[in-house]
């Protein structure tokens, strides 16, 4: 089987809209969570979010953007950055059947869908006032459809949607297609729009943080005793994933080699993780116990139950060996939902490159179950050779990815 490496990254997130901004935020432990006046005005319980502010979105012309929802726009910017970062010539990736794209979103595009529903309720003439571009804007494969068209991708092109594990599945699938010789290079990632319409759905579930509306920077509290739910966010990320010899032939910079990937299902509960699925996933990605892990970027979202179940799963996986250093970057960024998997892989790659571990911020009273679990609470300068990133989602879907410094 062929070896697979990562040669380019692009990101739009609550802590920065490019590699330089994100690196600075990670190292300094900067929170991207802010107060939301819009959420307050609607009377939502939660009034904080990891907002996305993207001026460069204006580079997309009206002709291009009319089919795009915000997740597609974020993804367009991330892909432009990833291409530039990987130093790929247009002549190579365009119209090349050996170059593909796999990118998805974990949630429905609620902003466009709800706007359409409201229009239908208010108007008898349903054909009037609805955008002719709405079908593409709201279809689950909207991101991959728009990007593959705009960037002239000829290889495999489709979307995966698996809740908060979406973009991690996209990365893993790209890895396997290249590993088995189906493609030589794949753009892989995902995007999620941040909107009031989407936030309302999670607010109704009482899944969002509500106790820190007056102090938004402290609202995302993974592993703190007083955590009370996740903070919603969004954004996009894109990786350039490439066969090793292809990367070497063009003298590309290699962030890391992908050496492990697994995907499992809990098969037990829609919203409460079993823990068993996570254990099986991490063990499969590690191929038993053959791959030691220096650092683990946890899924950790700040929910009362989910954080503990993942920690217990990690404890069992590493029961008789050295535990990896652990941090939860969602404590800074909030939860990017379908974009979180690729976001956290990018954060992990930056830590590998610059030899540090970003902190889990906002731990004022460490959860007792997290004691002796090597939770990093302050930026730590240390060389990392091998790292794992976990992404889990509603429906009991689990992904573990392992990368190694090349």
Curated annotation (Swiss-Prot):
Enzyme kind, highest EC tier: transferase
Keyword Lipid biosynthesis: yes
GO molecular function: 3-oxoacyl-[acyl-carrier-protein] synthase activity
Signal peptide boundaries: none
EC id: 2.3.1.41
Subcellular localization(s) per the UniProt record: Cytoplasm
GO BP term (any one): fatty acid biosynthetic process
Domain Ketosynthase family 3 (KS3) intervals: 1-405
One Pfam family here: ketoacyl-synt
Gene Ontology cellular-component annotations: cytosol
Reaction(s) catalysed (UniProt annotation): a fatty acyl-[ACP] + malonyl-[ACP] + H(+) = a 3-oxoacyl-[ACP] + holo-[ACP] + CO2; (3Z)-decenoyl-[ACP] + malonyl-[ACP] + H(+) = 3-oxo-(5Z)-dodecenoyl-[ACP] + holo-[ACP] + CO2
Known pathway: Lipid metabolism; fatty acid biosynthesis
CDD domains to which the protein is assigned, alphabetical: KAS_I_II
Active-site residues, as the UniProt record annotates them: 164 (for beta-ketoacyl synthase activity), 299 (for beta-ketoacyl synthase activity), 335 (for beta-ketoacyl synthase activity)
Chief subcellular location: cytoplasm
Keyword terms of this UniProt record: Acyltransferase, Cytoplasm, Fatty acid biosynthesis, Fatty acid metabolism, Lipid biosynthesis, Lipid metabolism, Transferase
Tree of life domain: Bacteria
Record has Transcription as a keyword: no
Described purpose of this protein according to its UniProt entry: Involved in the type II fatty acid elongation cycle. Catalyzes the elongation of a wide range of acyl-ACP by the addition of two carbons from malonyl-ACP to an acyl acceptor. Can also use unsaturated fatty acids. Catalyzes a key reaction in unsaturated fatty acid (UFA) synthesis, the elongation of the cis-3-decenoyl-ACP produced by FabA.
Assembly and oligomerization: Homodimer.
Family per record: Belongs to the thiolase-like superfamily. Beta-ketoacyl-ACP synthases family.
Protein name: 3-oxoacyl-[acyl-carrier-protein] synthase 1
Organism: Buchnera aphidicola subsp. Acyrthosiphon pisum (strain APS)
Gene: fabB
